Amino acid sequence: MMQDLRLILIIVGAIAIIALLVHGFWTSRKERSSMFRDRPLKRMKSKRDDDSYDEDVEDDEGVGEVRVHRVNHAPANAQEHEVARPSPQHQYQPPYASAQPRQPVQQPPEAQVPPQHAPRPTQPVQQPVQQPAYQPQPEQPLQQPVSPQLASAPQPVHSAPQPAQQAFQPAEPVAAPQPEPVAEPAPVMDKPKRKEAVIIMNVAAHHGSELNGELLLNSIQQAGFIFGDMNIYHRHLSPDGSGPALFSLANMVKPGTFDPEMKDFTTPGVTIFMQVPSYGDELQNFKLMLQSAQHIADEVGGVVLDDQRRMMTPQKLREYQDIIREVKDANA
């Protein structure tokens, strides 16, 4: 309930404020229109009074040169006539006195006190409107545009040499440190291709164990190796041992030799190696070598390792193949 009452009071107050604003605007507009509407009548009345005043002067003095008076009755001189009219005692002066604009200034006691025409309501209305409208306005705009033009003229003259000086300043340090010549990198020489290599792989027992010698010798013979030179096993081109040797097998324990008559011996593993280049196709010989190593590892329960005695990986096998191709290209 209180909110509704507050809302009603706010609305009523807003309406009252708007009504006051509209009434004030309407009243000021009405007064302004009436002031502009009465102004021509006042001007006609003042002009008519001036004409009657001039006719009286002509009748009293009888001089025809009084018409010069009418030429000087411009609106800008309305103030001078209004100041001269309140003194009827001096109408006997010669007519040329009214044509001179400086005589009212020479007789200040006569022009200072106009007792009859001072209370006119029309004079205070005309004076504030006409004086600022005609006298000061044409003089001020002529002086104002002249001063900024003269002031702005020297600015571009003084500002012109500044960029020129700034342009020459960075050019003064002629002996600027020149960048030191960068040494050209030495041409990278192509690594000479190897003309021979040794491909090595191992068959070893699991960590902490050893291979049985009798079982190992049987698996070696089943893989096609034949005991031969240097007391090690060789894989020849033909399974019966004829033809050149493709790759060989040695004991991992020094001196790396075998004794076929010894049945009860153990070893941590064996090493299979192939000299490249070799007889025939080296890549095919490498595949046969890998198959033999896997066969022996499966028979004795061991694992196939690379030349670093790490688990053989596909990446290492591709590396071996790349080495074989490089040697073949070098010997082509």
UniProtKB/Swiss-Prot annotation:
SMART domains membership: ZipA_C
Similarity annotation: Belongs to the ZipA family.
Record organism: Escherichia coli O127:H6 (strain E2348/69 / EPEC)
Keyword Cytoplasm attached: no
Bilayer-crossing regions: 7-27
Region (Disordered): 42-190
Subcellular location: Cell inner membrane
Functional note: Essential cell division protein that stabilizes the FtsZ protofilaments by cross-linking them and that serves as a cytoplasmic membrane anchor for the Z ring. Also required for the recruitment to the septal ring of downstream cell division proteins.
Pfam family, one: ZipA_C
Gene Ontology BP, a term: division septum assembly
Coiled coil: none
Assembly, per entry: Interacts with FtsZ via their C-terminal domains.
Cytoplasmic face residues: 28-332
Gene3D superfamilies tied to this protein: ZipA, C-terminal FtsZ-binding domain
Biased composition (Low complexity): 99-115, 123-149, 160-175
Record bears the keyword Transmembrane: yes
An annotated GO cellular component: cell division site
Stated name of the protein: Cell division protein ZipA
Lineage of source species: Bacteria, Pseudomonadati, Pseudomonadota, Gammaproteobacteria, Enterobacterales
PANTHER family: CELL DIVISION PROTEIN ZIPA
Residue ranges annotated as Periplasmic topological domain: 1-6
Encoding gene (name): zipA
Skewed-composition ranges (Acidic residues): 51-63
Keywords: Cell cycle, Cell division, Cell inner membrane, Cell membrane, Membrane, Transmembrane, Transmembrane helix
Membrane topology category: Single-pass type I membrane protein
